[in-house]
């Protein structure tokens, strides 16, 4: 950890028992970052402005978090990208989970709810991952999607619509060709 980061943390971190590994980058140039007590932030993580990390959170190696709320006791695996999103209490994200936060057609992100579609007016908006949800490796969540609490997603699922609580996985057919 650089001396500059150590000095910044000494002045700005109020909580105790936070473990921040070497080569972590906390971007202080454009806004505040909040880190709760009893957190572990792995090597080469990049925490960008506007991020709130609640108590007891674990963040894996080389994960980038931008303008997101990570609620208490959530675990975010290595090499994840979490942007403009909320990860609720005790959620678990496996390695390389991605939250997409903008549309390729450059239109504002909207959110579908039971009451109808909310036009957010936001150019960038990620997703909501419900409490105690468990996401397997390489899950991708499209902008404005909601994953209900207690939902489990298997590896490589692409979340294209809101998901009610349940267990979801991809069907794969493995075919042996030749001898």
Regions found by a protein language model. Give the residues of each.
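Short, charge-rich amphipathic segments
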Residues: 16-28, 67, 87-90, 126
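Short coil/loop residues immediately preceding or within conserved phosphate-binding loops
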Residues: 30, 48, 65, 82, ...
């Amino acid at each position: 950890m650089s001396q500059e980061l150590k000095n910044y943390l000494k002045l700005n971190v109020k909580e105790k028992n936070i473990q921040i590994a070497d080569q972590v980058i906390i971007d202080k140039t454009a806004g505040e970052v909040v880190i709760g007590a009893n957190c572990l932030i792995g090597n080469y993580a990049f925490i960008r402005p506007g991020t709130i990390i609640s108590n007891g959170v674990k963040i894996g190696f080389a994960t980038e978090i931008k303008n997101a709320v990570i609620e208490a006791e959530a675990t975010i695996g290595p090499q994840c990208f979490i942007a403009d999103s909320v990860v609720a209490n005790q959620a678990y994200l496996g390695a390389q989970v991605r939250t997409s936060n903008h549309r390729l057609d450059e239109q504002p992100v909207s959110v579908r709810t039971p009451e109808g579609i909310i036009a957010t007016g936001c150019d960038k908006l990620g997703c909501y991952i419900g409490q105690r949800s468990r996401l397997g490796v390489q899950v991708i969540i499209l902008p404005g999607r909601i994953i209900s609490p207690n939902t489990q997603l298997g590896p490589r699922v692409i979340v294209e619509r809101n998901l009610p609580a349940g267990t979801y996985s991809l069907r794969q057919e493995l075919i042996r060709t030749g001898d």
